[in-house]
Regions:
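Boundary/entry segment of secreted carbohydrate-active catalytic domains
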Residues: 35, 42, 122-204
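Active-site cleft segment of glycoside hydrolase catalytic domains centered on the general acid/base Glu
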Residues: 236-323, 327-347, 377-386, 417-435
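Glycoside hydrolase catalytic-domain groove-lining segments
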Residues: 210-225, 329-377
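Substrate-binding cleft of secreted/luminal carbohydrate-active enzymes
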Residues: 158-165, 256, 366-454
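Aromatic-rich peripheral "rim/lid" segments of glycoside hydrolase catalytic domains that contact
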Residues: 125-136, 409-481, 512-541
Length: 542
């Protein structure tokens, strides 16, 4: 009996094994069929693309992509969403294109395709349409909400700065007449609080005596770009470093000490693939200057905005860093236009976003050098109008989107350490100069240490109510169009205000809407008066 039962048990096991094998085979077969169906549908979608039937192709790609996601074939899924985004762009349905590329970024990231993910996100950002509203208020209304209590930090507002010694219209290095501390304010119509100087590590502080003397006489500070041009190895805890700190402390001039900036980029000689090496040197310099120059020096850590992925690796620590800066430039580049129309659709303003989100909660953040070029250098094409728009939008909207920004330095030169001509010089372009004058005339931008902006901004949204009274309203409006010419505001279908330039400031009376939640329709138009986008912004009125 036991043998019989054993045979029965064995037989049952064999039957179960055969059944499991059949099920597994059937499942694999089903998956193979699904895969074959997916690739068959893909070929059909490609054919539809070739015929210009983009909507039908999109429908096919949308059937395929989820199947690849289910099978965790994330690279293939990303490819499908790339095509969905591309086809929506061809149909000029840009919001849908953005959604497709965002999914491409997501799944290419899951597939470990980092660069593809970054490129997809960049395309999405360039075509993304959005709007944010702000109301102007007083500095007293925001109090210390935007301050950190750091050395040299204005409670509200941003110190105005520039690099100007290479502009021949404002500075003659041989005769010191003119000198930029005098002539640059005359050129721009406003006193600047600080000027950037480059300084080679190992030189005595006395080598820039004329700059220090003029800064002291003009009541301006210095952002000292301390550069170890022989590499980090020359930076030691020695007599030179301590003497440099003592000399700066005795100078009577306030100094932002920007040590070895842009360290995250491989184009600087002090770049190291081992961030700990850089961090150790920064912390050494910070330790010496905090001890030897406690009244005159604020330590500045200033990476380049790119590459983003390694910025945090080089951060030396809160105890070593007083301010966080960033290099922020825009040069017209049509090669990345998602629509292939030869436009640069990037936002100069949003290039500040990453560094702000990373550090503004704990440190004063600022643009330690930056500018917008008025030439497309590769083609020698004039892009003044584009540059003026981007510059005006940047200075006008920066205080609204990034209220904890504490200084902005314009790079007033057409040259830097590279051989490439960059075209940022204000005196060389009357329209750019006029735009700069307009941009920095805002009282938010401060001419001296100790000043405070009388104005501030608060969001106008469902979460941040506005008073039921007339308000001075501004907006940040980002669209696929590189520039805009007009923005209108409508409530309940009725246009209540119109503005003709960034930050799209207008007077809107919210009194009729007290105690209500409303939608403000923000309509943006291009230079041909064509509607580009309508963004509905929910606003609570108290």
């Amino acid at each position: 009996v036991r043998i019989y039962r054993g045979r029965t048990t064995f037989g049952r096991k064999l039957l179960l094994l055969l059944a499991a094998t059949l099920i597994a085979f059937s499942t694999a077969r089903a998956q193979d069929v699904q895969a074959m169906d997916a690739w068959g549908a893909y070929k059909q979608a490609q054919k539809l693309d070739g015929q210009g039937k983009y909507a039908e192709a999109i429908a096919k790609y949308k059937q395929i992509a989820p199947e690849f996601v289910k099978q965790r074939q994330y690279g293939n899924a990303a490819g499908m969403y790339r095509r969905i985004g591309d086809d929506y762009a061809k149909l000029q349905q840009y919001d849908n294109a953005v959604a497709g590329w965002e999914l491409e970024a997501k799944y290419s990231g899951l597939a470990g395709q980092t660069q593809i993910s970054i490129a997809a996100k960049r395309r999405a950002d360039m075509l993304r349409s959005k709007a944010s509203l702000f109301v102007e208020t007083t500095a007293g209304a925001v109090g210390g909400a935007n301050a950190h209590g750091a050395k040299f930090e204005p409670k509200n507002g941003a110190l105005l700065g520039a690099y100007a010694e290479l502009d021949p219209a404002v500075h003659n290095p041989k005769t010191a007449n003119p000198f930029y501390t005098d002539r640059f304010p005359a050129l721009t119509g406003k006193k600047h609080a600080a000027y950037l100087l480059y300084f080679t590590y190992g030189q005595p502080f006395s080598s820039i005596k004329s700059h220090v003397d003029h800064a002291r006489a003009a009541g301006t500070a210095i952002e000292l770009g301390l550069q170890p041009l022989k590499g980090l190895g020359e930076v030691k805890d020695d007599a030179y470093l301590h003497q440099l700190a003592r000399d700066i402390e005795a100078s009577g001039v306030q100094v932002f000490l920007r040590f070895a900036n842009e360290m995250n980029g491989d184009w600087v000689i002090w770049h190291t693939k081992d961030p700990n090496e850089y961090i150790a040197k920064f912390r050494l310099v910070a330790k010496v200057f905090h001890r030897e120059a406690p009244n005159s020096v604020a330590m500045v850590w200033a990476p380049d905005r790119l590459p983003e992925y390694n910025i945090q690796d080089y951060y030396p620590g809160d105890d070593a860093v007083d301010w966080v800066g960033v290099s922020l430039y825009s040069i017209f580049d049509p090669s990345l236009d998602p629509l292939g129309q030869g436009e640069d659709r990037s936002s100069h303003l949003e290039k500040f976003d990453n560094i702000y989100k990373l550090y503004a909660a704990r440190k004063p953040v600022f643009v330690s050098e930056g500018g917008v070029s008025y030439m497309y250098p590769e083609k020698k094409q004039d892009k003044t109008d584009w540059a003026v728009y981007k510059m005006n939008e940047f200075y006008a909207t920066l205080p609204m989107l990034y209220p904890k920004v504490k200084a902005v330095f314009w790079f007033d030169s057409n040259h830097d350490a590279s051989a490439r001509i960059k075209n940022y010089m204000l005196s060389a372009n009357p329209k750019l100069l006029a735009g700069y004058k307009q941009s920095v005339s805002s009282p938010f931008y401060l001419s001296s240490f100790g000043d405070e902006s009388p104005i501030a901004y608060k969001p106008a949204s469902a979460a941040s109510p506005v008073p039921a009274s007339p308000q001075r309203v501004s907006a940040y409006v980002k669209t696929w169009s590189p520039t805009l010419a007009k923005v209108t505001y409508a409530i309940g279908g009725r246009t209540v205000a119109t503005a003709a330039s960034p930050p799209w400031t207008a007077q809107i009376d919210f009194a009729p809407y007290g105690g209500k939640k409303i939608e403000v329709d923000v309509r943006a138009y291009d230079g041909r008066n064509k509607l580009v986008t309508t963004q509905k912004v929910p606003v609570s009125v108290k």
